[in-house]
Amino acid sequence: MDIDSTLINQEVIDLLGEEAGVGEQVAKITERAMRGELDFKQALEERVGLLAGLDESVFERTFARVTFTPGALELVRSAHSKGWKVGVVSGGFHEVADKIVAAAGIDFCLANRLEAVDGKLTGKLAADIVTKESKLIQLLDWAVECGVDMAHTVAIGDGANDIPMIQAAGTGIAFCAKPKTREAAPFAIDERNLMLAMDIILRD
């Protein structure tokens, strides 16, 4: 599943933008990108550029502000109780995502990495950008790794960059999603309670 606005209530890059004093500017770009109005790669690079000069200590402060979506931890526990694996794919950043994953007990994580020199963010990414295509590829790879048929996979997300994985999964769910994503998804949840996903999964 996606992390920002899905597993958690916030958009991590917006929180980082607030720390950099450019919160409103970053949030506007995020909103347009998630609606599919902007090229995601270009929008991400633009927002990351605004974070240049931030100290790496910002990641601990940012994680402290993160709250899990209602039902998120219960969904992970419920999945594990059935012997299922849970992975997250995010256009956000490993520096915060890894802390979220550890707190939630999630099995796999794919996210972006921010470049830092001498403890300061450079405003650039340290590796290839996680795109809608790479989210889909990662879902396919994890299914193969776990020996799970695609018909038995689940994908949950809210943004335009989640559409390919949502459509490819055996059960694809738009969660409190942007209109474009909701229209493209086989299933949709409009209430901020991730445990509702389990009802869909078990019914589908």
Regions found by a protein language model. Give the residues of each.
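C-terminal cap/substrate-recognition subdomain and adjoining C-terminal extension
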Residues: 61-204
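Active-site neighborhood of HAD-like aspartate-dependent phosphohydrolases
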Residues: 1-41, 45-46
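A structural signal for alpha-helix termini and helix-coil/disorder junctions
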Residues: 22, 35, 50-54, 65, ...
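Hydrophobic alpha-helical segments
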Residues: 16, 23, 28, 50-53, ...
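Short, flexible segments with low predicted structural confidence
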Residues: 14-15, 32, 44, 50-51, ...
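Short, basic/glycine-rich phosphate-binding loops at helix/coil junctions
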Residues: 43-59, 118-122
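Conserved active-site and cofactor/substrate-binding residues in soluble primary-metabolism enzymes
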Residues: 11, 21-24, 38, 54, ...
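Short, surface-exposed acidic
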Residues: 26-27, 56-59, 150
